[in-house]
């Protein structure tokens, strides 16, 4: 007589593995230029990055190359990415640059600034719909950042100094 409990456990594990694989959405487009690979998503494709349920700390920063405060704070995000990437830590820099600027401006920017954190582009013109899905309190201004781990989640519509960013990250680690 087969061990049904073992079969059920095995099927459940396989189910969750498949769900995890398929929850990572496919990009709308993948750009490759000058050794940089950049994925572009609509909001439905980006949303899984905003709602992972595992023991990893996620830092998601919304920025653009034309946003002076965004560009000013990016080195702080890069420094924190380098400092914490050995732990269960994932940083994603979500560019809100226009699609026509990806190859001419975003990719050269990534290369010139030597950005090591994962950069993706959000290409979804229906901002009035997706902004409130990111955070109810978000006006749409950038820079904006979400930091979350499991059920703890905070949204910031502000620029960060290095010290402020590290303090917030540490509040999720400790």
Residue ranges, per PLM feature:
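Bacterial Sec-dependent N-terminal signal peptides
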Residues: 1-28, 174
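Short, internal strand/loop/helix patches
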Residues: 109-142, 150
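Structural microenvironment flanking redox-active thiols in thiol-disulfide oxidoreductases
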Residues: 75-113, 126-132
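N-proximal helix/coil linker or "cap" segments that precede and/or mark the start of modular domains
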Residues: 21-40, 108
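Short pre-active-site segment immediately N-terminal to redox-active cysteine/selenocysteine motifs
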Residues: 56-58, 62-66, 98
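A short beta-strand-turn-helix
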Residues: 37-58
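Conserved redox-active cysteine motifs that mediate thiol-disulfide chemistry
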Residues: 62-79
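Thiol-/selenol-based redox modules, centered on thioredoxin-like
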Residues: 142-174
């Amino acid at each position: 007589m087969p061990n049904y409990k073992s079969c059920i456990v095995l099927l459940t594990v396989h189910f969750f593995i498949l769900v995890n694989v398929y929850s990572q959405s496919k990009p709308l487009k993948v750009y490759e230029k000058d050794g940089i690979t950049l994925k572009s998503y609509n909001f439905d494709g980006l949303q899984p990055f905003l709602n992972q349920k595992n023991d990893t700390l996620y830092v998601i920063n919304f920025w653009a190359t034309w946003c002076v405060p965004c560009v000013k704070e990016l080195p702080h995000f890069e420094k924190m990415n380098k400092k914490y990437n050995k732990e269960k830590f994932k940083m994603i820099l979500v560019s809100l640059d226009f699609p026509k600027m990806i190859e001419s401006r975003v990719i050269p920017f990534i290369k010139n600034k030597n950005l090591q954190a994962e950069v993706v582009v959000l290409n979804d013109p229906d901002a009035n719909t997706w902004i409130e899905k990111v955070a109810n309190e978000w006006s749409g201004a950038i820079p904006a950042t979400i930091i979350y781990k499991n059920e703890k989640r905070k949204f910031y519509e502000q620029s960060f100094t290095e010290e402020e960013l590290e303090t917030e990250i540490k509040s999720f680690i400790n």
